């Protein structure tokens, strides 16, 4: 039995892709409260003795203030991602930016630790390897919101850790196939052709289990107040596809100019975190599902 003091942790967006993997590996001494509005539906989330579920919206200020006061730390995962931001501009601003500001202020007022999930997409396009001191260059609404969120937290919180997460992949109870590597692997199971758009763009990648482990470590080490790149190795997108399948078609694509390599030396040194998963180990987790269903694609949901 784990005899460490019980830690109460609030997880926003905890019924989502990263959140459910985090909950699957919850430390024995943690009791989690999940707040999630389960956009798009989710039949795979199951509360337990150590996991309390609150179906609610992070824009509800009185609810958020109450939940934050009841917990020791907050892991802030909730947000509108990717193409859903320009498709739902009003909600994206209120959820990604305005609600994040309130959460940061409530955490600071109550003396709670805040762990925020940002994205390496804030680097946009950069031919040099980016570290945490590299000037952000957001090229879309989502990454711009994350830059704003980071700045808000640094301005309003005394006890925080910001992760800039790389391109995430891996199996989750709340699966997503609007993530490129996941779609590549799933299509390979069905023996289908993989379309690679461009392919010469660089991406730092991170398995969702490794990301979840970093979140746990960020809460446990409450002395570390900084920004960390949460990434494993850097890959060209075409090279990633070739690791997964031989059935590849390269498609000319100019709508996404992002390309960035990212240095992870700070997280290795400061948090003592190490990634353990890779593309090959991820492939064994996948199962054949109807990957074209709307539930697997956040951008198909209406948030307004």
What are these regions (language model features)?
Residues 101-141:
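Conserved Rossmann-fold NAD(P)-dependent oxidoreductase catalytic core, especially the SDR/UDP-sugar
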Residues 145:
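Active-site helix of classical SDR
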Residues 58-95:
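NAD(P)H-binding glycine-rich loop region in Rossmannoid oxidoreductase-like domains
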Residues 123-124, 140, 163-179:
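Flexible, glycine-rich beta-alpha linker
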Residues 192, 197-304:
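C-terminal substrate-binding subdomain of Rossmann-fold SDR/epimerase-dehydratase oxidoreductases
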Residues 74, 87-114:
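NAD(P)-cofactor binding segment of oxidoreductase domains
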Residues 9-28:
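N-terminal Rossmann NAD(P)H-binding glycine-rich loop of SDR-like oxidoreductase domains
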Residues 119, 150-172:
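Conserved beta-loop-beta element that borders a ligand/cofactor-binding pocket
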């Amino acid at each position: 039995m784990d005899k460490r003091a019980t830690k109460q942790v609030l997880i926003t967006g905890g019924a989502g892709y990263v959140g459910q993997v985090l909950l699957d590996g919850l430390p024995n001494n943690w009791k989690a409260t999940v707040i999630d509005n389960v956009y798009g539906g989710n039949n795979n989330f199951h509360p337990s003795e150590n996991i309390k579920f609150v179906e609610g919206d992070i824009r509800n200020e009185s609810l958020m203030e109450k939940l934050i006061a009841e917990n020791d730390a907050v892991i802030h995962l909730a947000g509108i991602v990717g193409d859903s931001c320009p498709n739902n501009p009003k909600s994206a601003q209120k959820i990604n930016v305005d609600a994040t500001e309130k959460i940061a202020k409530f955490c600071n007022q109550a003396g709670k630790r805040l762990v925020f999930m940002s994205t390496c997409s804030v680097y946009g396009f950069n031919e040099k390897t980016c570290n945490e001191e590299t000037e952000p260059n957001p090229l879309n609404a989502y990454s711009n919101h994350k830059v704003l969120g980071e700045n808000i937290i640094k301005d309003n919180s005394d006890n925080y850790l910001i992760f800039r997460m790389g391109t995430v992949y891996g199996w989750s109870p709340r699966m997503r196939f609007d993530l490129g590597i996941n779609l590549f692997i799933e299509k390979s199971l069905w023996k289908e052709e993989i379309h690679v758009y461009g392919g010469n763009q660089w991406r730092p990648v991170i398995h969702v289990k490794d990301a979840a482990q970093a979140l746990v470590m960020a809460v446990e080490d409450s002395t570390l107040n900084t920004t960390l790149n949460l990434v494993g190795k850097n890959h060209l997108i075409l090279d990633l596809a070739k690791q997964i399948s031989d059935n590849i078609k390269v498609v000319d694509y100019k709508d996404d100019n992002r390309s960035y390599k990212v240095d992870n030396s700070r997280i290795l040194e400061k948090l003592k975190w190490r990634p353990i998963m890779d593309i090959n180990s991820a492939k064994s987790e996948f199962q054949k599902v109807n990957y074209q269903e709307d539930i697997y694609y956040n951008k198909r949901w209406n948030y307004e």
